[in-house]
Regions:
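A glycine- and charged-residue-rich anion-binding loop/surface
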Residues: 1-229
Length: 229
């Protein structure tokens, strides 16, 4: 069990082969000394519970003896690998159970987490093979959920189709982004672009060289909008 293992990162115990694969494909590994100090105080960094997340990052970094920038530089890429692991496992369970990605309802959530995981992979140069991830998850889960192994091929096919749609959406997005960054973009516009075009605020921020800011609670607001529909 994680609590008695003495390790700071539970993903390394709950999905070891998947995480090992992601470390290899990204060329990154966690700084265990930093993570051992960070994990006990990381609960303060819930964006839905604080008014100024950057201030909390700074105070958290000071508490454990790091600069804010150094802490973020370590935490963001590694936590993105764990997000990819978590999202892909969720997709295996959901798709094996018969759900499908779509632009509405629960299917919207599945499409969103797939695309978020791909965005993380692209941002941090992870050489990601989603089919391999699905195989690793099914293998690790086989003792508890042997039925998942029977669905691996069908899940891989669904995700290959999603990858084609994702790639096409990025091509279209680039054309739209080049026009959008010349205009004023408020939070409502960011939400509209994400919902209708799949354009993330991170893409707009990067293209505008930081002029367009990413709201810290953006994805919470996206989820809230869809819960109300």
């Amino acid at each position: 069990p994680w609590l008695t293992s003495g390790k700071p990162i539970n993903f390394e115990l709950t999905m070891p082969q998947t995480v090992k694969y992601l470390y290899k494909q990204s060329g990154r590994k966690p700084d265990l000394d930093l993570w051992t100090k960070f994990v006990p105080v990381s609960g303060n960094l819930n964006v839905d519970e604080v008014d100024d997340i950057e201030k909390i990052w700074a105070s958290t970094a000071r508490k454990i003896g790091y600069s804010k920038n150094k802490l973020k530089k370590e935490i963001y890429p590694i936590s993105s690998l764990y997000a990819i692991a978590d999202h892909s496992r969720t997709l295996l369970f959901a798709l094996a159970d018969g759900a499908l990605p779509s632009n509405s309802g629960g299917g919207y959530n599945l499409r969103s987490i797939y695309r978020r995981s791909m965005d993380f992979a692209n941002k941090y140069n992870v050489k990601l093979d989603y089919s391999k991830l699905i195989e690793l998850h099914a293998k690790e889960l086989k003792p508890q959920y042997p039925e998942l192994s029977k669905s691996v091929k069908s899940v891989q096919e669904i995700l290959k189709a999603e990858e084609r749609k994702y790639t096409q959406s990025k091509i279209v997005s680039k054309r739209i982004i080049s026009k959008i960054i010349k205009t004023t973009v408020d939070e409502n516009k960011l939400l509209e672009l994400y919902d209708s075009k799949g354009i993330t605020p991170e893409e707009l921020s990067e293209a505008s060289k930081g002029k367009i800011k990413v709201p810290s609670d953006f994805y919470l607001k996206v989820a809230s909008r869809h819960e109300k529909r």
